[in-house]
């Protein structure tokens, strides 16, 4: 299996469980820096490698009137502060091919949103930056179908690819996670990350915005780690009820440390007693 490194944080192989985490969207400069610092403090105590993630533009919000973020220029400036002042690797998403090059100047890895996981020009542009690419699996795709998206990246000479499971559409306004997806994705030869919080969205289920079921974060995250994923993706907020995006499915900051304590123990058992599936 290919091992992927994002700013010194390793995914796959014999690396310990890694975490990609942050707020869904950059809400303000002060909030982003404060939250990043507090997340780093917690992950450092638990010895969990951290990649910080926040979006500068949520281009696929349900409603035209929903908060999208500060935009690319201001967003990248804020992420650059997080990177250099806190020493954290940065991952953020792009929605257009023209965003790839400027984002790659700041971010240590580029993310392809699940809704855009088949957009060839976007994937090729991300690959050509030479940065690691985190491919979110579309909510409409079978695990094995991600081999075609992976091939679009590797065909450009970039072997640094991660695939992230974020649930599959299950009727209207609902998602589910099929645990069989994790071993199937690992057979594609790339590290696998589990996006727990997005998997708990109820898309469009709250009158123009997505609802969510954050109460299931602990069991889903535990199951994913037990299934042998290489990393977890968590949206984290210090006050989810006031979050400007994805609050209903976000992990409350004050619940992060006990969650990581549990997950680290599970990961240690998986890594020391069995080969990852």
Where are these predicted regions, by residue range?
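Active-site-adjacent loop and "lid" segments of alpha/beta metabolic enzymes
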Residues: 65-73, 111-116, 172-176, 199-225, ...
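Catalytic beta/alpha-barrel core
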Residues: 69-71, 85-99, 108-121, 132-143, ...
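Glycine-rich, proline-tolerant flexible connector loops at the mouths of alpha/beta enzymes
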Residues: 23-32, 50-72, 236-247
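Catalytic alpha/beta core domains of metabolic enzymes, predominantly
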Residues: 129-130, 134-236
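Alpha-helix-loop-beta-strand connector modules within alpha/beta enzyme cores
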Residues: 38-46, 65-91, 126-132, 182-194, ...
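N-terminal amphipathic alpha-helix/helix-capping segment at the start of soluble metabolic enzymes
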Residues: 1-19, 268-277
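N-terminal small/glycine-rich loop or linker at the start of catalytic domains
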Residues: 7-26, 55-65, 191-206
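Structural preference for beta-strand elements that scaffold enzyme active sites
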Residues: 16-20, 47-53, 89-91, 109, ...
